[in-house]
């Protein structure tokens, strides 16, 4: 029987990423044959990964990578925040973003079939990571963003990589594009413009806003405060030319009733129309990048600020770790029991 030396164990660990005891056991079982030991560890890793397949992985990191005129943002999940800080996990996230930016897959299946520098597929890399790290590691999603030569990427990660953003800006420079990405990270827009909002979504959100006003008015009535008006519109998508024209006529009638001389109306009407637009685009302000107040200059919307510097936002992608994943809440006793059961089954 071959002698299993510390040097041999170290070599296997470096090649496979396995722990000391797992590497030693594999070498013993294969009589010191390095290639067979690697294959054995791989098979055991797949078995361990299969056992962990039904676990919920809602922690993790985003990865961002720019490759010329193509950029990728990815989300990779782990079960705990502790593992999300593991160097091997971070390396896997970064390698995933790079592979996707360079390979430009059309969907997750194509992404997982990409060949990594190690020669294994991305899917195998995740199986092996699950086995060696000891938690379910899963590739969740990616977005590819493209630009032209005269446009700029703004790549930004926030909160230790829990949020990843890529923005494309035309005009300005990379620093401006990054500032817009910082805004996207903080303010969570879901689309670029109101034209991308679903009409039913706008109606539903407007109903929610008016419900909030109704509750507020009940509180105001208790302290003899005047009621707030309900919102008739929530988005520019609902403001037809006729609606805007009628709003201007209503303002003129209001000014006439107040006895304001017509010669000063032209100075008053634009400000009141701005107020009308602000009051009737609350859904846009919550969900569309261009309509949000810019965090770098709160006197302007993102669109108005970019206009002022001869720039324009073209597109963006924003991922936040765990969005839409239902976390499983275990009490401490259940967690300990599950950990002990897993240890006995491995």
Swiss-Prot record:
One GO term describing the cellular component: cytoplasm
UniProt feature coiled coil, ranges: none
Record-linked InterPro entries: EF-Ts_dimer_sf, Transl_elong_EFTs/EF1B, Transl_elong_EFTs/EF1B_dimer, Transl_elong_Ts_CS, UBA-like_sf
Keyword annotations of the record: Cytoplasm, Elongation factor, Protein biosynthesis
UniProt region (Involved in Mg(2+) ion dislocation from EF-Tu), positions on chain: 80-83
An example Gene Ontology molecular-function term: translation elongation factor activity
Listed PROSITE patterns: EF_TS_1, EF_TS_2
Pfam families: EF_TS (PF00889)
Taxonomic superkingdom: Bacteria
Cellular compartments annotated: Cytoplasm
Chief place of localization: cytoplasm
Family: Belongs to the EF-Ts family.
Function description: Associates with the EF-Tu.GDP complex and induces the exchange of GDP to GTP. It remains bound to the aminoacyl-tRNA.EF-Tu.GTP complex up to the GTP hydrolysis stage on the ribosome.
Matching PANTHER family: ELONGATION FACTOR TS, ELONGATION FACTOR TS, MITOCHONDRIAL
Protein name: Elongation factor Ts
Originating gene: tsf
């Amino acid at each position: 029987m071959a002698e299993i030396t510390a040097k041999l164990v170290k070599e296997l660990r470096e090649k496979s990423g396995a722990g000391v005891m797992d590497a030693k056991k594999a070498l013993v079982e294969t009589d010191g044959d390095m290639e067979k030991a690697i294959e054995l560890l791989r098979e055991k890793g797949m078995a361990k990964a299969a056992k962990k397949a039904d676990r919920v992985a809602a922690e993790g990191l985003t990865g961002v990578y720019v490759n010329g005129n193509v950029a990728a943002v990815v989300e990779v999940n782990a079960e705990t925040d502790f593992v999300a800080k593991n160097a091997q996990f971070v390396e896997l996230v970064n390698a995933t973003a790079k592979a996707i930016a360079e390979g430009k897959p059309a969907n997750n299946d194509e992404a997982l079939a990409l060949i990594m520098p190690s020669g294994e597929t991305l899917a195998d890399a995740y199986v092996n990571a699950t086995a060696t790290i000891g938690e379910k590691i899963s590739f969740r999603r990616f977005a590819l963003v493209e630009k032209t030569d005269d446009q700029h990427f703004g790549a930004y990660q926030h909160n230790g990589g829990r949020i990843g953003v890529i923005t494309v800006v035309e005009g300005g420079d990379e620093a401006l594009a990054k500032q817009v990405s910082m805004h996207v990270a903080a303010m969570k827009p879901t689309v670029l413009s109101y034209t991308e909002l679903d009409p039913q979504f706008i109606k539903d959100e407007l109903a929610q806003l008016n419900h909030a006003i109704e509750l507020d008015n009940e509180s105001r009535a208790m302290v003899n405060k005047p009621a707030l008006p309900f919102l008739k519109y929530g988005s520019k998508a609902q403001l037809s030319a006729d609606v805007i024209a009628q709003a201007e006529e209503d303002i003129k009638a209001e000014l006439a009733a107040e006895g304001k001389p017509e010669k000063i109306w032209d100075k008053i009407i634009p400000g009141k129309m701005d107020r009308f637009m602000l009051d009737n685009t609350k859904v846009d302000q919550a969900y569309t990048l261009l309509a949000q107040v810019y965090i770098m200059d709160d006197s302007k919307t993102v669109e108005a600020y970019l206009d002022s510097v001869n720039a324009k936002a073209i597109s963006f992608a924003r991922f936040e770790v765990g969005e839409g994943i239902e976390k499983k809440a275990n009490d401490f006793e259940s967690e300990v029991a599950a950990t002990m059961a897993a240890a006995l089954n491995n």
